[in-house]
A protein has these predicted regions:
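Acidic, glycine-anchored loop motifs typical of Ca2+
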Residues: 112-121
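A short tyrosine-centered beta-strand micro-motif
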Residues: 93, 100-109
Length: 173
């Protein structure tokens, strides 16, 4: 009986050690033409350059779940959405991500300049909804979240890059 209990817990114990799955949340996050449901239209401002790709992710707006492992969130039935698109060579930089319902969500955009699918603070840019001031640690979810309405909600996220000893927008001195 004890071994059965151990086997039942195995998926929960291993979920925290499984590396991020790059395709999790993509199907749920992809916007479709003329779709009326709730979504964020994210304008990305302050790019260092037009290389690499954007990775836009949506998390529950709770301290415990914000920036948590995507496998753990999905296994627990919590909101996780992801959109990955190449950075356009020119023109506006807008991304669309669907959310399950109107409400508050943590939103983050990674400018993955070398396309390695992970955040390298020395190379890549990062931005959050609400555009909180960043140091070298993640912001509080209350400062890095936005409210999605019942339709498409527009937000602007300013990218931050390593400048001196902290992450900050390029336009700020």
């Amino acid at each position: 009986m004890r071994s059965l209990a151990s086997l039942a817990l195995l998926p929960l114990l291993t979920a925290a050690t499984i590396p991020s799955t790059p395709d999790l949340g993509k199907a749920e996050g992809r916007c479709r033409s003329n779709e009326p449901g709730p979504a964020f239209i994210v304008s990305v401002a302050g790019l260092r350059d037009r290389t690499g790709q954007f990775k836009l992710e949506v998390y529950p707006a709770t301290a415990a779940d914000f920036l948590a492992d995507d496998n753990v969130l999905v296994a627990a039935g919590k909101t996780f959405r992801r959109v990955e698109v190449p950075v356009p060579a020119s023109g506006p930089t807008e991304l669309c991500v669907r959310v399950p319902r109107a409400g508050r969500y943590g939103v983050v955009v990674l400018h993955d300049r070398n396309r390695d699918r992970r955040f390298n603070w020395r190379v890549d840019g990062i931005g959050f909804a609400g555009n909180p001031r960043l140091g070298l640690s993640q912001p509080d979810v209350a400062e890095a979240s936005a409210v999605a309405g019942s339709g498409r909600t527009s937000i602007t996220i300013a990218m931050n890059y390593l400048r001196g000893m902290r992450m900050r927008p390029l336009a700020t001195d």
